[in-house]
A protein has these predicted regions:
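Long, charged alpha-helical interface segments
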Residues: 128-189
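Short acidic/polar capping segments at secondary-structure boundaries
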Residues: 21-23, 102-105, 123-127, 151-152, ...
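N-terminal nucleotide-binding beta1-loop-alpha1 segment
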Residues: 1-21
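A generic local secondary-structure boundary/capping motif
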Residues: 4-6, 86-87, 108-110, 135, ...
């Protein structure tokens, strides 16, 4: 059996790289494993180029100074960089995107959470939106943070540690029930 896998375009999550400060090369390697479509900013493009990583799209209104001749330009226009990238990915039919960033503002991602599956890697945290009824197996003693506001959160398998911080009570599944369409949670990498 061949070790080469054929992946159809857009089956795997795209990769939006907004910043690499403090992001582990091994973790980046895992995100690059299936040759995702890579979208980035000019500054981060230089860092990726130095590592020999092929970029598909650069988010910029500037069109000069190509690092690689086959890079496409994604204009920002009057949007934020995040909105320009998300709108592009949704329009192109991507079901999911992994995002590596040095800055995280939940409000920038909320408008897209019901349109594309988001997984955000920020400061040794993995952040993602979950629906009510979500459950996941984790070892005991792991930290789970609730990043979205909710007034009717019911948990199982978690002990409250701080305002929005929970610790898994034992090896096994934890679950979350709430009234909102989704909540953003984070776990440590």
């Amino acid at each position: 059996m061949s070790s080469h896998h054929i992946v159809r375009e857009k089956q795997e999550p795209a990769l939006l790289v907004l910043g690499l400060d403090g992001f582990d090369d091994e973790q980046l390697g895992q995100l690059l494993e299936w040759s995702p479509t890579i979208i980035t900013t000019p500054i981060t493009a230089e860092k990726l180029n130095v590592q020999g990583i092929k970029i598909d799209w650069i988010i910029t209104d500037e069109t000069d100074g190509d690092l690689q001749s086959d890079i496409k330009h994604l204009p920002v226009g009057d949007k934020t960089i995040i909105a320009a990238a998300m709108d592009h990915l949704i329009e192109k039919g991507y079901p999911a995107v992994n995002i590596v960033t040095d800055e995280f503002e939940l409000a920038e991602y909320l408008p897209f959470a019901d349109k594309i599956n988001l997984v955000i890697f920020y400061r040794q945290q993995k952040i993602y939106a979950v629906p009510s009824g979500f459950n996941k197996w984790k070892p005991g003693g792991e930290e789970i943070r609730i990043l979205s506001s909710t007034d009717q959160l019911k948990t199982a398998g978690l002990e409250k540690s701080d305002a929005d911080v929970y610790i898994t009570s034992a090896d096994g599944f934890f679950s979350l029930e709430f009234n909102e369409p989704f909540l953003f949670i984070s776990e440590k990498l």
